[in-house]
């Protein structure tokens, strides 16, 4: 086995441990191996033998036992100053000649000439992917092993490219790779540098390119070779700034519109902007008095009108006024019960109605479930119309129900039945108005009902005069809880003392209404 890098051959025999001189000068017999003569020679005069590296001892390892190997070759090899470490063997130093340090002929100097490839790999990790690139152990551009810091020379290349592409400072993927190879930087460093440069120019108001989306990185609206002069850059900066300010102003206007929409009131909006609105439609500004149609009696046309009010801004004030007018009507009913001969107080002659959008004013159809309430309401209106109540206390009925009043029966009450007056309210409202009119205090204080109470109380003691006073077809409640006959309110009852213990109520359909 020859080692040409040392300059002379070595054999694989045990004599490879010796130099070109014989070992007879330091050993008793030249035929003995170093393994046999080593321990014997150590007991005699000391000799100095050079320490050989592990590469030269690899082939003769089978002839050396562990004790001899540790005693002779246990000292490690030092640094690169040559084979200078010696072990004392008990012989004269001039008998041995140390080998000079050998260098590799290729002159790379990456590893020592005597070290095997495995030992060299322990000190210098070998990367096959990086060996073919001449950029200081960088295999690919984005290798994460070592990152080169950006220097003035590398950034000058990037600045030059940025100066040439002021119109569009967005390098493509290929241009980034090219710049990374030239500047010996990674691809991430190049992308970060360009992003920071664009941000810095924006902050300094030196933007010479239109803003673009990040997703359109590969689209280049301008050519790479186009350059821009200083005057053109200045002229380009002005429209960009003005466009920016206009954009901000438009954005503010849009935000103001959105804030206005938050306070949007459907009642105040115009019909042209929003199609679907509240079911109540706004009429003309201010309340409007509409005379009744000609199908009612003549006295009703002059005495009563219908008040239609808009639901706009002045609706609250008009409604408050109508409520106050209704309260005055109730007060006048209690204080002056016999004022119906003059037609009632003028404040009670106006009726507040709402015109519902999409519904005809003369709608007469009702669900069947409210037929009982409708009948009871009609009967109550018939009974109450024969008393001296003003018109504001009566519920106006359509042509299908019983007429509210007639001029012959009571000249104090006028009830025109025009198209707007025939408009039916909600059945719940009709029933509630009937209950309120029959059972609540303002009506109970009326003199006619008080006469009925007194008459009913007298019927408990003497039913004969009661029958004569009320007539043949009239029944009166004789017990507070049991109701077995339909009572009605008499038309002509003589006055009597006030009493509220018993209640005479109107009834329709054979079923009495009791409290």
From Swiss-Prot:
Residues 214-223, 237-257 have a biased composition (Basic and acidic residues). Residues 224-236 have a biased composition (Acidic residues). It is found in: Nucleus. Expressed in the developing central nervous system, skin, and vibrissae, but predominantly expressed in the cardiac ventricles of the developing heart. Not expressed in the developing metanephric kidney or adult kidney. Gene3D superfamilies: Homeodomain-like. Residues 399-419 have a biased composition (Low complexity). Residues 144-205 bind DNA. Keywords: Developmental protein, Differentiation, DNA-binding, Homeobox, Nucleus. The keyword Flavoprotein does not apply. Residues 205-258, 278-307, 398-425 are annotated as: Disordered. It holds the Pfam family Homeobox_KN. InterPro entries: HD, Homeobox_CS, Homeodomain-like_sf, Iroquois_homeo, KN_HD. GO terms for biological process: cell differentiation; establishment of animal organ orientation; heart development; negative regulation of transcription by RNA polymerase II; regulation of transcription by RNA polymerase II. One of its GO terms (cellular component) is transcription regulator complex. SUPFAM superfamilies: Homeodomain-like. SMART domains: HOX, IRO. GO terms for molecular function: DNA binding; DNA-binding transcription factor activity, RNA polymerase II-specific. Interacts with the vitamin D receptor VDR but doesn't affect its transactivation activity. Belongs to the TALE/IRO homeobox family. Likely to be an important mediator of ventricular differentiation during cardiac development. This is Iroquois-class homeodomain protein IRX-4. It comes from Mus musculus. The gene is Irx4.
């Amino acid at each position: 086995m020859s080692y040409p890098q040392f300059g002379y051959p070595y054999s694989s025999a045990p004599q490879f441990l010796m130099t070109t001189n014989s070992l007879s000068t330091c050993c008793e017999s030249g035929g003995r191996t170093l393994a046999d003569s080593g321990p014997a020679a150590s007991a005699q005069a000391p000799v100095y033998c050079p320490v050989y590296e592990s590469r030269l001892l690899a082939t003769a390892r089978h002839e050396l036992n562990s004790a001899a190997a540790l005693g002779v070759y246990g000292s490690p090899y030092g640094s690169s100053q040559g084979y200078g470490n010696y072990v004392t063997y008990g012989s004269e130093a001039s008998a041995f000649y140390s080998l000079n340090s050998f260098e590799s002929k290729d002159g790379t100097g990456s590893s020592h000439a005597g070290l095997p490839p495995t030992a060299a790999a322990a000190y210098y990790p070998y990367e096959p992917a990086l060996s073919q690139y001449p950029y200081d152990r960088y295999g690919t551009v984005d290798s994460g092993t070592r990152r080169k810091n950006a220097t003035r020379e590398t950034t000058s290349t990037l600045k030059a490219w940025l100066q040439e592409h002021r119109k569009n400072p967005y390098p493509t993927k290929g241009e980034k790779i090219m710049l990374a190879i030239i500047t010996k930087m990674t691809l991430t460093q190049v992308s970060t540098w360009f992003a920071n440069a664009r941000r810095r120019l924006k902050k300094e108001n030196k933007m010479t390119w239109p803003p673009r989306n990040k997703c359109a990185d590969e689209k280049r609206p301008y050519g790479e070779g186009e350059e821009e002069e200083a005057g053109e850059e200045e002229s380009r900066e002005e429209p960009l700034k003005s466009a920016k300010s206009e954009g901000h102003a438009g954005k503010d206007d849009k935000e103001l519109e959105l804030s206005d929409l938050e306070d949007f009131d459907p009642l105040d909006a115009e019909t042209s902007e929003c199609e679907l609105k509240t079911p109540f439609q706004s009429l003309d500004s201010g309340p409007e008095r509409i005379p009744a149609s000609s199908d009612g009696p003549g006295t009703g046309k002059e005495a009563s009108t219908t008040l239609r009010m808009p639901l706009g801004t002045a609706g609250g004030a008009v409604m408050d006024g109508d409520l106050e007018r209704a309260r005055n009507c109730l007060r006048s009913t209690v204080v002056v019960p016999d004022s119906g001969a003059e037609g009632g107080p003028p404040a009670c002659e106006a009726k507040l109605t709402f015109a519902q959008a999409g519904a005809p004013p003369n709608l007469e159809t009702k669900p069947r479930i409210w037929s009982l309430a409708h009948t009871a309401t009609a009967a109550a209106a018939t009974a109450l119309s024969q008393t001296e109540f003003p018109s504001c206390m009566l519920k106006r009925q359509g042509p299908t129900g019983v007429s509210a009043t007639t001029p012959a029966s009571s000249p104090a009450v006028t009830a025109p039945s025009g198209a707007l007056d025939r408009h039916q309210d909600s059945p719940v409202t009709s029933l509630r108005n009937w209950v309120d009119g029959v059972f609540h205090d303002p009506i109970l204080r009326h003199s006619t009902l008080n006469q009925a109470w007194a008459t009913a109380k007298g019927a408990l003691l003497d039913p004969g005069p009661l029958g004569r006073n009320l007539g043949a077809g009239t029944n009166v409640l004789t017990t507070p809880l049991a109701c077995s006959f339909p009572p009605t309110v008499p038309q002509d009852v003589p006055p009597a003392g006030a009493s509220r213990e018993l209640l005479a109520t109107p009834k329709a359909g054979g079923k009495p209404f009791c409290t």
